[in-house]
Amino acid sequence: MKWVTFISLLLLFSSAYSRGVFRRDTHKSEIAHRFNDLGEENFQGLVLIAFSQYLQQCPFDEHVKLVKELTEFAKTCVADESHAGCDKSLHTLFGDELCKVATLRETYGDMADCCEKQEPERNECFLNHKDDSPDLPKLKPEPDTLCAEFKADEKKFWGKYLYEVARRHPYFYAPELLYYANKYNGVFQECCQAEDKGACLLPKIDAMREKVLASSARQRLRCASIQKFGERALKAWSVARLSQKFPKADFTDVTKIVTDLTKVHKECCHGDLLECADDRADLAKYICDHQDALSSKLKECCDKPVLEKSHCIAEVDKDAVPENLPPLTADFAEDKEVCKNYQEAKDVFLGSFLYEYSRRHPEYAVSVLLRLAKEYEATLEDCCAKEDPHACYATVFDKLKHLVDEPQNLIKKNCELFEKHGEYGFQNALIVRYTRKAPQVSTPTLVEISRSLGKVGTKCCAKPESERMPCTEDYLSLILNRLCVLHEKTPVSEKVTKCCTESLVNRRPCFSDLTLDETYVPKPFDEKFFTFHADICTLPDTEKQIKKQTALVELLKHKPKATDEQLKTVMENFVAFVDKCCAADDKEGCFVLEGPKLVASTQAALA
């Protein structure tokens, strides 16, 4: 990259980076401005999401009261922006409403202490009390009951969905949740007319649930990236992702969008849901206004209403890679001015490297592209301090190859394991692997994470080679972030803490490299995990699997160096025991009689 060209790029980037694409007009009343922009229904939905994400234990009706109060106040401010309190910040208005809740101390304990603080510390305090794993009842869809509720009051049904999802997922991307709530109501509009409501509803609800959980995990990773590694981490991720999706867009267009996309996510992660949704709509408009310069795939998205438009843009397929792109080596390895360009503006130069690499490689995972950029940066830091920098960095692309080979080999190996054993067997192999790596982690967390990791086989292994790596690596990033979020709340393993905090892009390789934790002191054998009753016979298959996998984790915590053969023997005995007693006439009597024998045979097998 010649010096004159690079300076032009730097000036363009600096301008785009500072300007972004949003109008940033000031308004006398922020709440009136957002109410006017968003409309009453979206305003109410977003306020309900915000309160539900902060006050996760409050009943729905209490939240509805808070939403009504704030909506009426917003309408007052729309009518007269100079009305008392209309000039207050949204944080102040929301915080004041939260602090009015009579049962705040009783229900949330020291969260009530937040109310003694001033903004912005008060909002930060509320954010810190969000619970990623709240103790809430499992939702079980009953088609007839749900259809009756839907027909009785569609608006309330929509609100109840927002409330139930938001309080279970306190970082859910709010404008996306509005989109899913509308889709959810649409499913009931269709299926409640059907003769067999359950046959129509349940598969659609299950499919939507998977999408909603994936959306929640993606946003939780974005928020964790900002919280733990700063905006730069999310910007780098977004540059790689958008460069893959919009490979014909130029670097300055990509960085403009990245700057404001980061602002949108930062707002939502920070609880500023009204600003987040409003800015996201503006960003979607900008992208559609400039679609010809960005991607041929956007047209279908841009004809949709605002919530569907934003969702469609986020999910849009990658555009075709432009033909005749020059080789990467020309600007980033062969050019003798690389160090000059890098030292003049490191982030711009590395950003352009990431952009150029990503747009040429839609088949790579974002996390892999970020590892390539990180190692390229480390190489330049080393080489640019030497007497002959060019001789040092000229072969850098050969040195980067291992970062692509490592995940490809790992995926091949794990997909072979999945194809041999199926999803449940693959999950069990991962339970053994991860319990040995981090036996201090709680049993429910190890089971949850291993089951989720095991689903990567079903999700990704059947995909074509060009899609396997992004599917696998990016999915694993979400699951490992969940482990890190849960572990941060109650840290028990130094190894897990190290992998979670040292490097966002190297989390997966760090966990892959962990071995048996030799510092762990095995726990005593606990009979309760091998004591069962007749109720296990009527459990759904998934819950039966979880019972067995819980026992497997506990076995490993008792005997982390147990051989695969020992574990196989114990688990086969366990399955035979359950099958025998579930087939018996007196099931409970069988469990009482045979249970102690299972405990004895298990202890003998592990001796």
Curated annotation (Swiss-Prot):
Pfam families per record: Serum_albumin (PF00273)
Residues that make up the propeptide removed upon maturation: 19-24
GO molecular function, one term: metal ion binding
Membrane-spanning segments: none
Cellular localisation: Secreted
Residue positions, PTM N6-methyllysine: K557
GO cellular component terms, semicolon-separated: blood microparticle; cytoplasm
Domain Albumin, residue spans: 19-209, 210-402, 403-600
Residues bound to Ca(2+) 2: D37, D278, D282
Residues annotated as binding Zn(2+): H91, H270, D272
Assembly: Interacts with FCGRT; this interaction regulates ALB homeostasis. Interacts with TASOR. In plasma, occurs in a covalently-linked complex with chromophore-bound alpha-1-microglobulin; this interaction does not prevent fatty acid binding to ALB.
Name used for this protein in its record: Albumin
Organism of derivation: Ovis aries (Sheep)
Native organism taxonomy: Eukaryota, Metazoa, Chordata, Craniata, Vertebrata
Gene that this polypeptide is encoded by: ALB
